[in-house]
């Protein structure tokens, strides 16, 4: 059997990072994934997909991403169930992500000014050098 999922979408909220009693990282997040077609009004609808990630990748996801970022994930679909406080059995279908990739640059506008100060001066005003090629072996 094959159970592979590949999604590209935007985070609808910041990743929620928790730890199990045995100190295993668990990240939950929601991806908004645009559909490939437009509705009758000409708008593109989106699906909002619940996802979970575990261990080191979960910590990396929480540390490096934020709401609104475009990311890609790979993983599998998984169904689980639990009993709520009213005693009802609740079934949940979610994507268990194995890996992620950030698909856009991080917003570093706050660091941009300090980076510009550290860049070397432009060479746009310099003159070309006259170098003789008589000594070249080819």
UniProtKB/Swiss-Prot annotation:
Which key words tag this protein in UniProt?
Answer: DNA damage, DNA recombination, DNA repair, DNA replication, DNA-binding
A single GO CC term, please?
A: nucleoid
Keyword RNA-binding in annotation: no
Specify where the region named Disordered lies, as residue ranges.
107-138
Q: Which SUPFAM superfamilies match?
A: Nucleic acid-binding proteins (SSF50249)
Q: Where is this motif: Important for interaction with partner proteins?
A: 133-138
Entry's Gene Ontology molecular function annotations: single-stranded DNA binding
Please name the GO terms of the biological process aspect recorded for this protein, alphabetically: DNA recombination; DNA repair; DNA replication
Q: What does this protein do?
A: Plays an important role in DNA replication, recombination and repair. Binds to ssDNA and to an array of partner proteins to recruit them to their sites of action during DNA metabolism.
Subunit structure, briefly?
Answer: Homotetramer.
Protein name, UniProt field: Single-stranded DNA-binding protein 4
Q: Species name for this entry? A: Streptococcus agalactiae serotype V (strain ATCC BAA-611 / 2603 V/R)
């Amino acid at each position: 059997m094959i159970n592979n999922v590949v999604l590209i979408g935007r985070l609808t909220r910041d990743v929620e990072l928790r730890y199990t009693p045995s100190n295993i990282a668990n990240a939950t997040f929601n991806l908004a994934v645009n559909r490939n077609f437009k509705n009758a009004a000409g708008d593109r609808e989106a699906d909002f997909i619940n996802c979970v990630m575990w261990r080191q990748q979960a910590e990396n996801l929480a540390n490096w991403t934020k709401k609104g970022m475009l990311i890609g994930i790979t993983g599998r679909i998984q169904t689980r169930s639990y009993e709520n406080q009213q005693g009802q059995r609740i079934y949940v279908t979610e994507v268990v992500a194995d890996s992620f990739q950030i698909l856009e640059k991080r917003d570093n506008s706050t660091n941009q000014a300090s980076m510009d100060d550290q860049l070397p001066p432009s060479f746009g005003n310099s003159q070309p050098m006259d170098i003789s090629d008589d000594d070249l072996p080819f």
